[in-house]
Amino acid sequence: MVSAIVLAGGYATRLRPLSLTKPKALLPVLGKPLMDYTLYSLASSDVDTIYLSLRVMADKVLDHVKQLNLQKNIVSVIEESRLGDAGPLKFINSKYNLSDDVIVVYGDIYAEIDFNKLLEYHQSKGCNATLTATQVEDPSRYGVLITDGHRLIQIIEKPKTPLSNLVNAGIYVFKKELLNKIDGLSISRDFLPKLLVSDTCVSVYPYKGLWMDIGVPRDYMRINLELLTLKYPKGFISQSAKVSEKAELFPPFYIGDNTTVGEGSSIRNSIIGVNNRIGNGSCVEESILMNDVMLGDFSLIKESVIGDEVSLGKWNRVDGAIIGDGVLIHDQVFINRDTIILPDKEVAESVYDKGKIIL
């Protein structure tokens, strides 16, 4: 028997306004919720029970997971108070009969990891804990790892001058008995250092695939567009989508179910979700349009993220903005770079100042 704990209870304040109306784990990544990549990987492994640690908008996560038909035993655990990322491990271990080896993974990271190979590696090294590591371009944003062979020696959180580009990928395997020793809120700041001080063997599993911690909007944009290039270099159009013969499509692109693209419009390096309507003569470039978006004629969306059920009028230009769910933008409106518009707002006048927040 193998148990897994998926941590998906965070507030995701740095991803607002996107996370104000949906939990970070359910933000769409190339047409499906972020958490699904982890859940399907777990479902294809030897894991038999998946524990979901939830807090913020837990009902939305549960409703979604029920529709997945994972054919695994799913147990939801609702955090009644803030427990950090370490607290749920101790709580779940005290309440349920976990397996000897427990996989722990954050629900807000992207990684197509083979959990069976991770378990095999963990068991082969004979350590009580295994941490998954990945290499990144900017390690100063993460927990940087100092290793000796396959063993973890030290973890340094967000150093100004990183000693390496090897960082904590947020996927672990712990021996069940270790979870009783948790007395802090953070795995990387409290629990792992305590294990290392007590000379507990922590092995490091090298992960070489595509990985991203979806912490801020630019991370969210980046993982979507990188995955788009990787999965659909020639583009993808759903069979139920209707794209005008006079529209121009420049790969890579993704056009979801029941979406229409009008004549004279162009889609370039962008992800268009489900039930969207792109008017005539409009352009979408390096952007993400979630679901049920209405884009009027002769408008331009560039380097932006547009939430669900957003309605944009004609002759609009949105340049490098993040727009929350349910926003209404009138005709002939310009939205400048780094603008953030909170959900359900109505915008009738242009936003010329960069970095403005529409509350």
UniProtKB/Swiss-Prot annotation:
Organism of origin: Sulfolobus acidocaldarius (strain ATCC 33909 / DSM 639 / JCM 8929 / NBRC 15157 / NCIMB 11770)
Gene that encodes it: mpg1
Reactions that this protein is recorded to catalyse: alpha-D-mannose 1-phosphate + GTP + H(+) = GDP-alpha-D-mannose + diphosphate
GO molecular function: GTP binding; mannose-1-phosphate guanylyltransferase (GTP) activity
Enzyme Commission number, as recorded: 2.7.7.13
Keywords from the UniProt entry: GTP-binding, Nucleotide-binding, Nucleotidyltransferase, Transferase
Pfam family of the protein (one): LbH_EIF2B
Stated family: Belongs to the transferase hexapeptide repeat family.
InterPro entries (alphabetical): Mannose-1P_guanyltransferase, NTP_transferase_dom, Nucleotide-diphossugar_trans
TM annotation in the entry: none
Keyword Transferase: yes
Protein name: Putative mannose-1-phosphate guanyltransferase
Lineage: Archaea, Thermoproteota, Thermoprotei, Sulfolobales, Sulfolobaceae
Single GO biological process annotation from the record: biosynthetic process
